Amino acid sequence: MDKQEKRIRRARRTRAKIKELGAVRLCVHRSLNHIYAQLISPRDSKVLVCASTLEKEVRSQIKHGGNIQAATAIGKLIAQRAKKAGVTKVAFDRSGYKYHGRVRALAEAVREGGIEF
């Protein structure tokens, strides 16, 4: 089993537990150059809010999308959009990634934005 298969297996386990809770899920995906965040509804699995470093407004603020500063910017943006959508509490789905670096920076920025985990 390689590194990616292990990550996907961890992600499946986490998603199953979050599904039992029935909470809105904050799903994070990271690549080498970008980071993506989505709020997904528990019932019909539809995306309520999304933000990524590919968006024009974010690209103008940051130089490179694959670092901690970019993750912090995305965390703040997703928190603002979540509040507009009426979401105040979420379950954090880190997609099998370690809670470290960019994933941690995004999560902390979302918490600072007023969203509860």
Curated annotation (Swiss-Prot):
Tell me the InterPro entries matching this sequence.
Ribosomal_uL18_bac-type, Ribosomal_uL18_bac/euk
Q: Which Pfam families match?
A: Ribosomal_L18p
Q: Which domain of life is it from?
A: Bacteria
For this entry, list what GO says about its biological process: translation
Alphabetically list the UniProt keywords. Answer: Ribonucleoprotein, Ribosomal protein, RNA-binding, rRNA-binding
Single GO cellular component term = cytosolic large ribosomal subunit
Question: Is Transit peptide tagged as a keyword?
Answer: no
Q: Is Ribosomal protein found in the keyword set?
A: yes
Q: Which GO terms describe its molecular function?
A: 5S rRNA binding; structural constituent of ribosome
What NCBIfam families has UniProt attached to this entry?
Answer: L18_bact (TIGR00060)
Similarity-based family: Belongs to the universal ribosomal protein uL18 family.
Q: What does this protein do?
A: This is one of the proteins that bind and probably mediate the attachment of the 5S RNA into the large ribosomal subunit, where it forms part of the central protuberance.
Q: Which PANTHER family match?
A: 39S RIBOSOMAL PROTEIN L18, MITOCHONDRIAL, LARGE RIBOSOMAL SUBUNIT PROTEIN UL18M
Q: What assembly does the database describe for this protein? A: Part of the 50S ribosomal subunit; part of the 5S rRNA/L5/L18/L25 subcomplex. Contacts the 5S and 23S rRNAs.
Record's protein name: Large ribosomal subunit protein uL18
The primary gene name is rplR
